[in-house]
Design a protein with these regions (language model features):
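Conserved alpha/beta-hydrolase catalytic His-Asp/Glu region
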Residues: 119-170
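Conserved HGGG/HGGXW glycine-rich cap/lid loop of the alpha/beta-hydrolase fold
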Residues: 2-44
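Gly/Ala-rich beta-loop-alpha elbow adjacent to hydrolase catalytic centers
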Residues: 67-75
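Short alpha-helix in the alpha/beta-hydrolase fold that links the catalytic acid
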Residues: 23, 174, 188-197
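Short beta-strand/loop motif that positions the catalytic acidic residue
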Residues: 172, 178-180, 184
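Acidic catalytic loop of the alpha/beta-hydrolase fold
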Residues: 183-187, 212
């Protein structure tokens, strides 16, 4: 049984649309208050502005934040605000340290690079993002999601990724669950170690899946999310072990 007063807020990956949460939403319990954050299109936001945008749309009741990939940085910035409603955080294939700095900054010099990425053939992106987990539903999700992505925002968020979280020495006392992708080709396997070292209550669960965990193994991720949810519902953060 869930506690309907505690909600879950989903923060999207670099696309910013929220549409790619569909596979996860379909397997989460229907009675949980769920908020899907969509970053504003045509708005170039700094990392801090992303976090403050999210803060405005978070439920006023207790909430657990699920931050996917790029939004791991937003989630950290959000935690820096010390909002009392946030009772726990789940990072999916996230990172804190600067990522692919040379590659991203080199590509950013190419005019129209954001639009080029959007225009890549769906089968190419499907294979790169989902690998052997690819199926018709995920391909269809890409076909529907790509037109919704703002190319300029995509490029700017990539630049934020290249910069990383600006307060790498910061520590957090809030309970944290890290969902790790064993087949991740975008985020290094060592990324979880930063979170293990900077969260006092930390757990890590690894899946034999690619970077897009919430799309390729949604049921397995939902089970871990709900396990974490139930621990916090019972107000027992000490039950979250440091396993990394």
């Amino acid at each position: 049984m869930t506690d309907s007063t505690t909600g879950i807020a989903l923060l999207p990956g670099i696309d910013g649309t929220g549409i790619f949460f569909e596979p996860l939403i379909h397997v989460l319990p229907e009675d949980i208050p769920l908020s899907v954050i969509t970053y504003p299109p045509n708005s170039i936001l700094s990392l801090e502005e992303h976090a403050r945008f999210v803060a405005e749309y978070l439920p006023t009741e207790d909430v657990i934040v699920v931050a996917e990939s790029f939004s791991g940085l937003v989630g950290l910035e959000l935690l820096h605000l010390r909002l009392p409603a946030i009772k726990g955080v789940i990072f999916s294939a996230a990172f804190a340290e600067p990522l692919h700095r040379i590659l991203i900054r080199g590509l950013s010099l190419i005019p129209g690079i954001g639009s080029m990425v959007k225009e890549l053939p769906v089968p190419v992106l499907d294979h790169f993002l989902f690998g052997n987990f690819s199926n018709k539903d995920l391909a269809n999700l890409l076909e529907r999601g790509l037109p919704k992505i703002d190319a300029k925002c995509l490029k700017h968020r990539a630049e934020i990724i290249a910069s990383g979280y600006p307060r790498l020495d910061e520590h957090f006392d809030i309970p944290c669950l890290y969902l790790k992708a064993a087949r991740d080709r975008l985020v290094p396997h060592t990324a979880a170690s930063w979170f293990a070292a900077h969260f006092n209550h930390f757990a890590c669960v690894e899946f034999d899946a690619p970077h897009c965990l919430l799309q390729t193994v949604p049921a397995e991720c939902a089970a871990e999310i709900m396990g974490f949810y139930n621990v916090l519902r019972d107000r027992n953060p000490s039950g979250i072990k440091n396993e990394e």
